Amino acid sequence: MNNKINNIKITQVKSAIGRKYDQRLTLVGLGLNKINKSVILENTNSIKGMVEKVKHLLKIENM
């Protein structure tokens, strides 16, 4: 079996200023708080849902 875990690299490209409170909390939950900060996370359903909520503020790359 292939036990390889898919990861995604998420980079914040737009500011959270002026966004809804829940979108700002979602960015914090993803580990993002500054423009151009990147994190590498496992590609799980919960992470996909969080990314979908704020995808207009992010750049997403598969790894």
UniProtKB/Swiss-Prot annotation:
Belongs to the universal ribosomal protein uL30 family. This is Large ribosomal subunit protein uL30. The lineage of its organism: Bacteria, Pseudomonadati, Pseudomonadota, Alphaproteobacteria, Rickettsiales. GO terms for molecular function: structural constituent of ribosome. GO terms for biological process: translation. The gene is rpmD. InterPro entries: Ribo_uL30_ferredoxin-like_sf, Ribosomal_uL30_bac-type, Ribosomal_uL30_ferredoxin-like. Part of the 50S ribosomal subunit. NCBIfam families: rpmD_bact (TIGR01308). It comes from the Bacteria. CDD domains: Ribosomal_L30. Keywords: Ribonucleoprotein, Ribosomal protein. GO terms for cellular component: cytosolic large ribosomal subunit. PANTHER family: LARGE RIBOSOMAL SUBUNIT PROTEIN UL30M (PTHR15892:SF2), MITOCHONDRIAL RIBOSOMAL PROTEIN L30 (PTHR15892).
